[in-house]
């Protein structure tokens, strides 16, 4: 738990095109209530119209660090919450008050495991929706998963719901001064002149596995290389919003439906559904 200082969180949200999901909006409204209840402060910072997600994240970090340079007592945590994540404010409180350097939520992938559906339906239709979803989880010790208050250590975690202590960035600046860069961004019509631009969130090829790592997994590796740990909250429910295409062909439906047969004028049998 955090002691001797009231936590203060900058919620950082990349929102390309200025778009936010309904669940995100409800979550932001909810977190103000949860923060007041749990005695910490929140400030919302968004970045629209930056198509490069890596640069958006690094810029939001630089703004967090700029604010800290101006007033070291202003923020204790930066929390990335992506605009397509639906959440409850208490999930944010669990991250902030956990005491972990990096604490993350786990949300479903934007996919449905269609191949498993027949098997799942045969077993039981209870919780079918949840069983058909997939999650990106890479436990640090899969043979002995230790859970404390719903949190466990992992190798990788997504940035879409990630709470990071300020001290993490200060340690990384000291360890990775070579990652500092000069920004060429134009923000609000002006050249962005922050002195705190570091490529902490950038895609890499992992040295050991040769895997291509996204910017969130790459950040995890940088932090782990200097002795840091990543924890995830297994208890807090999250929603991952996406655009699902309901693609259909009514002719195909007739052909595969076994309920009622009809004959078309060309002589081919069709199947007609009763509903």
Predicted regions and their residues:
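Conserved catalytic core of nucleotide-sugar-dependent glycosyltransferases
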Residues: 88-203
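Short, conserved alpha-helix that lines the donor NDP-sugar binding/gating region
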Residues: 53-71, 221
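Short beta-strand-to-loop acidic/aromatic patch adjacent to the donor-nucleotide binding site
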Residues: 70-86
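Alpha-helix termini
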Residues: 32-39, 65-74, 176-179
């Amino acid at each position: 738990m955090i002691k001797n200082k009231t936590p203060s969180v900058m919620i950082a949200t990349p929102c390309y095109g200025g778009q936010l999901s309904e669940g995100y909006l409800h979550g932001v409204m909810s977190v103000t209530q949860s923060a007041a209840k749990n005695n910490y402060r929140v400030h919302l910072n968004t970045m629209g119209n930056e198509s490069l997600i890596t640069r958006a994240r690094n810029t939001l970090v630089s703004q967090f660090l700029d604010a800290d340079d101006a007033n070291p007592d202003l923020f204790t945590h930066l929390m990335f919450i992506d605009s397509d994540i639906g959440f409850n404010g208490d999930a944010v409180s669990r991250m902030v008050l956990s005491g972990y350097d990096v604490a993350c939520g786990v949300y479903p992938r934007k996919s449905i495991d269609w191949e498993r559906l027949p098997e799942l339906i045969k077993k039981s239709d209870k919780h079918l929706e949840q069983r058909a979803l997939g999650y990106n989880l890479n436990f640090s010790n899969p043979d002995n998963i230790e859970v404390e208050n719903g949190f466990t250590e992992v190798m990788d975690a997504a940035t879409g719901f990630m709470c990071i202590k300020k001290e993490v960035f200060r340690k990384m600046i000291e360890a990775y001064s070579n990652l500092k860069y000069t920004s060429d961004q134009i923000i609000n019509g002006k050249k962005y002149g922050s002195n705190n631009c570091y490529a902490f969130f950038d895609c890499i090829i992992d040295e050991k596995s040769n895997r291509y790592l996204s910017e969130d997994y790459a950040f995890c590796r940088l932090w782990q290389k200097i002795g840091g740990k990543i924890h995830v909250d297994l208890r807090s429910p999250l929603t991952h919003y996406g655009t699902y295409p309901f693609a259909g062909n009514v002719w195909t439906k007739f052909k595969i439906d076994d309920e009622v047969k009809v004959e078309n004028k060309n002589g081919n049998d069709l199947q007609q559904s009763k509903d």
